[in-house]
Amino acid sequence: MLKDLNKVRNIGIMAHIDAGKTTTTERILFYTGINRKVGETHDGASTTDWMEQEKERGITITSAAVTCFWNGNQVNIIDTPGHVDFTVEVERSLRVLDGAVAVFDGKEGVEPQSEQVWRQAAKYDVPRICFVNKMDKLGADFYFTVQTIIDRLGAKPLVMQLPIGAEDDFDGVVDLLEMKAITWRGKVETGAEPVIEEIPADLADKAAEYREKLVETVAESDEALMEKYFGGEELTIEELKAGIRKLTVNSEVYPVLCGTAYRNKGVQPLLDAVIDYLPTPLDIGEVHGHKVGDETVDLVRKPSVDEPFSALAFKIAAHPFFGKLTFVRVYSGIVEPGAQVANSTKGKNERIGKLFQMHANKENPVDEARAGNIYAFIGLKDTTTGDTLCDKNDQIILESMDFPDPVIKVSIEPKTKSDQEKLGTAIQKLSEEDPTFTVELDEESGQTVIGGMGELHLDVLVDRMKREFKVEANVGNPQVAYRETIRKPVEKLEYTHKKQTGGSGQFAKVIIGIEPYAPEAETLEEGESATYKFENAVTGGRVPKEYIPSVDAGIQDAMQYGYLAGFPLVNIKATLIDGAYHEVDSSEMAFKLAGSQALKEAVAKAKPVLLEPLMAVEVITPEEYMGDVIGDINSRRGQVSAMDDRAGAKVVKAKVPLSEMFGYVGDLRSRTQGRANYTMIFDSYAEVPTNVAAEIVAERNGTA
């Protein structure tokens, strides 16, 4: 464990599903493994040996974090999946990363999932370097990929290397800083060292042109360097590296490297770039949180062992021997096995059993967890993803993570009584691991309904129930997570809750107004909801202040069950305008019931409508099927928003209701003889057309 945080990097490797992220990660673990076993000669262990070893110790590659070492530096790699249904995994990794490597397919350039992951990284302000992978692939084009980084991501790439050759003739890269060629010629064994050569004559002019751009970008970012550069002096390699590092850490530029991880070309320079340009925990600096019980009091923790202990749990994983592993990023302070800490999010104390760092092929017990690093804790009982762990005597709640609500649900029915019990265990374990996996009981049918981010997400969860927990169950058809909202304001609605029959009565009178509510995300304070707002406009104590939260709670209760078909209500602002109370008969419960009923009656008058999830769909198809594909999208109530060319194929972008996309994968295959593919990402909620809404409401209310 390195104590010097200047030598620590917490990074993630992020990519579209087939860009080669796993191979890149494996090669990084391989090369850093060699680096760790100093003194052992490398005996040409082939990729397959490594892969078998990977399979045997499957826990680490699938684990949330692996620690490895490179040239005296420690690199903690946090794994992120590439499939859109698992965006929550990406979201939670990015929350605890300091930097990331974005891997792009050298033929496809920036793909839809790359765009989404890039946007998520921008949300958490994570500095990135880019690796254009698969340069050996037929049709690979480095310059096209760099252009897509500009066009599709709106980012400023800083080209650090140029490829030497392409496809089968890809032999290495030109290093634009050192102005040397780094080559791996012919078939390269895993672990082979590159050869440093002169730049090939046919690339000399291009290399000079790109180096000039690079030097100019760095010089323009610093006055002293600018004077030196425009005064005709050369900038030193050290000055250039320091300038690039500063620009990268500030997310002003994104260094671009290239290679082919599968063919073992370009990985070592990528690791060098991770160390040279991505930030340390010290570069990231202090983290912000708030006081327990008062979100308005801002607290900070510096990345130092001298500060009080604070950490964020970012993933829970099951382990065959240790039960539950809780992966945490320690932001400040130091903690030892056996210590009692506070879970300030839950208001409970936890005792830490063992502490591990996950190394490339084993769990490594450590005797302390220090600021700036990533660990697995064992023995925590109540901690879930997004919880803060901290010093019991100096508590803080760190900013948590936002998890999207599920967009798709299925009912699941165990086949036997023993399956029923196993299902309970499976659901508990899986929902601990995955915050976007939800479970509810359908009161009408008595069925268990599970929710997730897409068909694949639920397939994987159901499959895990069968494999890991031996649950045999029947799975129903997918259901869409509809919502309800209102289209017009209701200025005043009066409701009196009255029950005065013997003994203590109940009395509460409220006058509320409601209106549609759709704030801009940027205007929201931390912790504020984007779908509901409550305002108290009562004056003169006509409703005592201790009853105001009860009215709010009653309104929120009523929003769980909408007017049209019982779907949750969203995007409503409710204002408590006036009311009345009784000295003896008023209570919190009376005002809660009054708030609840008032909302129900107000919604009925506010032109309620049904909302459905819209998906952003991108179909890549050969040109001859394009008409068919577009016609099919239109028949699914989709709206085509753009058409592009990409790598010899056509790209159709559209917004389509999720309810119309079930089974699309099979339809698309048969329509295009298996030659088209698509990606689908949740986009937004939109109003359901009246005729379709009428059918959904009738079916839901049993009047169809």
UniProtKB/Swiss-Prot annotation:
Statement: the UniProt record of this protein carries the keyword Chloroplast: no
Binding annotation for GTP: 15-22, 79-83, 133-136
Source taxon at top rank: Bacteria
GO terms classed as biological process: ribosome disassembly
GO molecular function: GTP binding; GTPase activity; translation elongation factor activity
UniProt keyword annotations, A-Z: Cytoplasm, Elongation factor, GTP-binding, Nucleotide-binding, Protein biosynthesis
GO annotations of cellular component type: cytoplasm
UniProt xrefs under Pfam families: EFG_C, EFG_III, EFG_IV, GTP_EFTU, GTP_EFTU_D2
InterPro entries named among the record's database cross-references: EFG_II, EFG_III, EFG_III/V, EFG_IV, EFG_V, EFG_V-like, EFTu-like_2, G_TR_CS
Entry keyword annotation includes Iron-sulfur: no
Family: Belongs to the TRAFAC class translation factor GTPase superfamily. Classic translation factor GTPase family. EF-G/EF-2 subfamily.
Known role: Catalyzes the GTP-dependent ribosomal translocation step during translation elongation. During this step, the ribosome changes from the pre-translocational (PRE) to the post-translocational (POST) state as the newly formed A-site-bound peptidyl-tRNA and P-site-bound deacylated tRNA move to the P and E sites, respectively. Catalyzes the coordinated movement of the two tRNA molecules, the mRNA and conformational changes in the ribosome.
PANTHER family: RIBOSOME-RELEASING FACTOR 2, MITOCHONDRIAL, TRANSLATION ELONGATION FACTOR G-RELATED
Name recorded for this polypeptide: Elongation factor G
Organism listed in the record: Corynebacterium diphtheriae (strain ATCC 700971 / NCTC 13129 / Biotype gravis)
Gene transcribed to yield this protein: fusA
